[in-house]
Amino acid sequence: MASPASVAGGGEDSNGCSSLIDPLLVSRTSSIGGAERKAAGGGGGGAKGKHWAAADKGERRAAKECGGEDGRRPLLFRSYRVKGSLLHPYRALIFARLIAVLLFFGWRIRHNNSDIMWFWTMSVAGDVWFGFSWLLNQLPKFNPVKTIPDLTALRQYCDLADGSYRLPGIDVFVTTADPIDEPVLYTMNCVLSILAADYPVDRSACYLSDDSGALILYEALVETAKFATLWVPFCRKHCIEPRSPESYFELEAPSYTGSAPEEFKNDSRIVHLEYDEFKVRLEALPETIRKRSDVYNSMKTDQGAPNATWMANGTQWPGTWIEPIENHRKGHHAGIVKVVLDHPIRGHNLSLKDSTGNNLNFNATDVRIPMLVYVSRGKNPNYDHNKKAGALNAQLRASALLSNAQFIINFDCDHYINNSQAFRAAICFMLDQREGDNTAFVQFPQRFDNVDPKDRYGNHNRVFFDGTMLALNGLQGPSYLGTGCMFRRLALYGIDPPHWRQDNITPEASKFGNSILLLESVLEALNQDRFATPSPVNDIFVNELEMVVSASFDKETDWGKGVGYIYDIATEDIVTGFRIHGQGWRSMYCTMEHDAFCGTAPINLTERLHQIVRWSGGSLEMFFSHNNPLIGGRRLQPLQRVSYLNMTIYPVTSLFILLYAISPVMWLIPDEVYIQRPFTRYVVYLLVIILMIHMIGWLEIKWAGITWLDYWRNEQFFMIGSTSAYPTAVLHMVVNLLTKKGIHFRVTSKQTTADTNDKFADLYEMRWVPMLIPTMVVLVANIGAIGVAIGKTAVYMGVWTIAQKRHAAMGLLFNMWVMFLLYPFALAIMGRWAKRSIILVVLLPIIFVIVALVYVATHILLANIIPF
């Protein structure tokens, strides 16, 4: 049987780059970055591939026998399912645990004996909820499917003998909200990696959305376009990976797969020097803009006029000014669309020298650059700007007028293309003869290259990206995750899939807005016969562009409801994917051995929890909206509906976890307290149920190709989140229902601390916020409970019965389990002392002993000194 590695795509890109970067199975160690970047291991032949078997042999055999004579498109991806030797025990364990849970519920209700009946009632309700939420999480995982793009087949089909391409157009969206919280250098590296991707330059365009309206981002984009004339041909000539210069130049010993090794050293040195100068220019932009503006403002004739911010061409910037005034401040400014790089002329433009004047030999290298556009949508206090969804919809409309590509892929500004073949990999799913026409979007896993080696706060989230998402791939497809996702433009427009689509669809102004050019572009998109084309430059077109990105264009249209990205919910990604799936579209999950995209994640605990609050709060908002999975999505498959329901209610679980986690305070009660009697049988039931869930987890680990550390980090951070971020989100939702105020959107800061010598300085900085109070209470309660338990043991060991000793042992076991789960939080409290984790290992037993001694001393004091 062929392994996934032996059948993945191969071939060369348009500049002769080898197939070393072709997509295979995703590697467990491929979230890499900087000097610590590791080679992607695993792949199809590793531990991850051996549990998967080809699922499309019959289809491939039929396609091969047909030889393409039926005129249909070829098979462009391969499907794999978990082998029966692993899948059948996995399913059996799920059913067995379900039966065990039901028996446990029945037993608890029949034996409603407890020392604290209100707590017994709450614990039973919690157990029922745990079982229900576990079932919602587990049912969609019955049929995991891995889909691998076949780049060789795509090249044979789309790369024609005359040098032209059959590839469709792609518009790439990059969104940034603030140049301070999201550093400009990150954003420009994202743009450079997009411009250098292996895709025909005349069929791709890049749009940067700047939600701050700041001149610095526009001028940084202009500088980036200049540097791209050197960087992009350099990447093509030498097959550079990754194509983000910051990430590439951090590599200690990058492997070389190009065809000109004798020129590489000199070329790399020159480009590196140019990149350093490019960074200096970016860093100097704020001061450059300020000095220029001061010069122009000093020459104004009306001294009472406000101090404007001036562009390099001597005109006033229409966006946010350094000294903000009405109509020129963040949150209130005109819409801006500026074409930084126009559409390249068709045909190969070969050059011996790059435009910067450096003597680099780019002979036989295509030096053209894709279209590059700056977009800053208009904002007005009288209109809701709808956060990221509003910015994406403005890009969607502007791109419709400029390039109107059939497919769209969006990135957060802190991500970059790690594998230049990524666009082609996604296109494999869109053009495949089986599901291509019904595929609305292709989601890639999120990978991060700035996470600490031990992944203290579970940023990699492998359980979700390598487990849950593959499971959804076997249903109607993965959910949209906000970045690294390719969309079919028609699906974003709210058009039904071909099977349900009506003939002769007429775009209406009431739905898409009052723009004739936009309505015409929708008709062209329906014909699916247009890719990126040169943009018109007449005044009418410019006015139309400014109108479609204005603050009021969405008003009284279907934008944000049935068209584009959905508004009024903090997690616009999940609800947008839900709306598209609900129309009958499917989605696909694309993994590549050398990860398609990499980004940065918040490694500071507080920043990470703020991110979780927004995600979980948005999920609850979705449940209490008309997009509730119980009532919405008329064409959702049943298990896909179950999956979305789980995504919207999971934060509620935290309330019962918090109840259990704080229950050890009962150790402080002098008398014995039993939650459930008979206690021994209760504990046995719990142990069996917990053991079974970890056996299921062990099988998931095997077919998902992750490690026990990945699994354990997921468990730990879920516990931290369940005592902090998730209850906060539930509280926000209650406030929202009472006051109609939504979840506040807080941009996750990507800035590191001033300690530039420590890559993980943010990891060791503790920023106290109110949501951490419950977690601290739980930690202190369990530390105190363990100490008191030790003290009680010392006092009562001689008189305790065996049952009492067993009760104490089980209580201690629970306390220690909670402590292990909160271990990352304890490290966070230690700050920089956490660099030596042995300190915590030594400190905790000392604290336990101190608490025990205090308890013993108090007991002696109360028993022998203070009379009653």
Curated annotation (Swiss-Prot):
Annotated positions binding substrate: 412, 414
UniProt-annotated catalytic positions: 211, 573
Gene3D superfamilies assigned: Spore Coat Polysaccharide Biosynthesis Protein SpsA, Chain A
Record-listed E.C. numbers: 2.4.1.-
Pfam family, one: Cellulose_synt
The keyword Membrane is annotated on this UniProt entry: yes
Membrane topology reported for the UniProt record: Multi-pass membrane protein
Family listed: Belongs to the glycosyltransferase 2 family. Plant cellulose synthase-like F subfamily.
Function field: May catalyze both beta-1,3 and beta-1,4 glycosidic linkage on beta-D-glucan. Essential for (1,3;1,4)-beta-D-glucans synthesis in grasses and cereals (Poaceae). The mixed-linked glucans (which are not present in walls of dicotyledons or most other monocotyledonous plants) are particularly important constituents of the walls of the starchy endosperm and aleurone cells of cereal grains such as oats, wheat, rice and barley. They can account for up to 70% by weight of the wall.
Name by which UniProt lists this protein: Probable mixed-linked glucan synthase 3
Organism expressing this protein natively: Oryza sativa subsp. japonica (Rice)
Gene (UniProt): CSLF3
